[in-house]
Amino acid sequence: MTYAPVTDVLSGKLAVDSEVTVRGWIRSRRDSKAGISFLAIYDGSCFDPIQAVVPNELNNYQEEVLKLTTGCSVEVTGKIVESPAKGQDFELAATEVKVVGLVEDPDTYPMAKTRHSIEYLREVAHLRPRTNIIGAVARVRNCLSQAIHRFYHEQGFFWMSAPLITASDCEGAGEMFRVSTLDMANVPMTDAGEVDYDKDFFGKETFLTVSGQLNAETYACALSKVYTFGPTFRAENSNTSRHLAEFWMVEPEVAFADLDDAAKLAEDMLKYVFKAVLEERRDDLEFFAQRINKEAITRLEQFVTSDFAQVDYTDAIQILQDSGRKFEFDVEWGIDMSSEHERYLAEEHFKAPVVVKNYPKDIKAFYMRMNDDGKTVAAMDVLAPGIGEIIGGSQREERLEHLDKRIAEMGIDASHIEWYRDLRRYGTVPHSGFGLGFERLVTYVTGMQNIRDVIPFPRAPRSANF
C-alpha cells in the first residue's frame, strides 16, 4: 500500500486511478441524502485538505464514519480521481476508512469547526497548529529556515553552534536571564555580602545568551565565513506585539569583509529566501494575502526585484527633518531611530528597502568599528517597507587599542572578554556581520501582526506555558 502526503495527491504528482492511503485529521464531514459522506482531510503537508468521498456501503459507515468530527484522526484508502467540483483537481474515492483516534467530546474540543480569535489560539498553543492560520505560519517558518541554511551552504559558509550559556553580555544592555543552580532559599554569600557564584555550577555568574555573535567571530577568524542560527534570550520586560523573551537569530560573520560586504550579503540573503518562499509556499502566501495582509505576495515580489537604497545615518536624519512630517518622536542627530522614522524612509522616501549606515557611536555596541570622524561607527540597519528594521549589523573593531578604548568608555569589565581581545592580538583581520531576528522575518512574510503568533511556544513576560 502506498502512503501519500495530501500535497502529492492534490498537486497531481500521483497518477489518476492510483490506489493510495492518506493519513491525517478530519477538518470537516458533510453527509448527503444520497448516502455519501464527504470528508475533508488534512495532514499539514499543504494548505488545502483533500476531499475523500465515502459511500455508505463501507462496513463501518454507520458505526464509525458518521461519528467522525473535526479533529478525529483517520487513514483513508481509495483511488485518486479527478474532482468534478470546483476548488481542487483531485479527490479520493474511498474504499476503506480506518478510524485511528476519536475526539472524546466534540462539544468541548477547543479546535471545533469555528473561527477562533488569534488571542484565543495563544491560550491553546499546543492545539493551535491544527488551525489553517498557524499551520500556514509553521510551513512558511520551515521554508524560510531551510532557505537560510541553503543560502549559506551555497555561499560557502560553515554553520557553527554558538553556546546558549555564556558569561558575556554581547550588547552591553544587561537584560539577561541568569543561569544558576544555587538554592534560592539559601543563597551563599561572600564576606562582602554579595552572592558567592564560586559555589554555583560554573563557578561564576552565567546567563542565557543574547547573541551568538562574539562566538561566531572566533570561528570566522579561522574558517573565514560562518553563521549561527539558534535561540537567543532577552530579559526585556516589554509586553508588546514586537518582543519575545526567547527568539531565534541568524548571525553570519565574514573575515576580511567590510561594512559594504555585510550589506551586500544581507541583500542577497533576503532576496534568496523571499524567492524561495514565493516558489515553495505559494498556497500559504495566498491565504495570508486573502485573510491577513493583501500585500503579502506583492510586497515580497517587489522586494526581490528592488535595488536597495543606501544612505548615511546623518543624511537620513536630514531627510526626516526636511520631510515636513510631524513624527511622534522628535528627530535629531544622535537618536536611535524609531519604527515610524524607519518606515517613512523605506515606504515613503525611498519606496524600497534601505541600508542606513554609519550610526553615532553612543547608540551602538562596543564592538563596532570606529570611523575616522571619531563620532560614528561602521554600523548598518536594513529597513524594509512595511516593518522597518529587519537586520542590524556592523564591521567589527579589529584594532585592539580602539576596542579597549570603547570597552573602557562603556564601563565593561574587560576581564570577562579577554578571549575576545585575543582575536585582535593574534592575526587580527577586518571582519563584519549582522543579525537577523528570525521571527521578525516570519512576521514580515506572513503579515501576522503579533510576533507571538509566528513561534510555536512564545515566551514573554509572565508567559511561559507549555
UniProtKB/Swiss-Prot annotation:
The protein's Enzyme Commission number = 6.1.1.22
Gene Ontology biological process terms in this record: asparaginyl-tRNA aminoacylation
Q: Which Pfam families match?
A: tRNA-synt_2, tRNA_anti-codon
Q: How does it assemble?
A: Homodimer.
PROSITE patterns xrefs: AA_TRNA_LIGASE_II
Keywords in alphabetical order, please: Aminoacyl-tRNA synthetase, ATP-binding, Cytoplasm, Ligase, Nucleotide-binding, Protein biosynthesis
**Gene Ontology molecular function terms on file:** asparagine-tRNA ligase activity; ATP binding; nucleic acid binding
Superkingdom in the source lineage: Bacteria
Coiled-coil positions are: none
User: What is one cellular component GO term in this UniProt entry?
Assistant: cytoplasm
Record bears the keyword Ligase: yes
> Protein name, please?
Asparagine--tRNA ligase
**Chief place where the protein resides:** cytoplasm
The record's family statement is: Belongs to the class-II aminoacyl-tRNA synthetase family.
**Catalyzed reaction equations:** tRNA(Asn) + L-asparagine + ATP = L-asparaginyl-tRNA(Asn) + AMP + diphosphate + H(+)
- Where is it localised? Cytoplasm
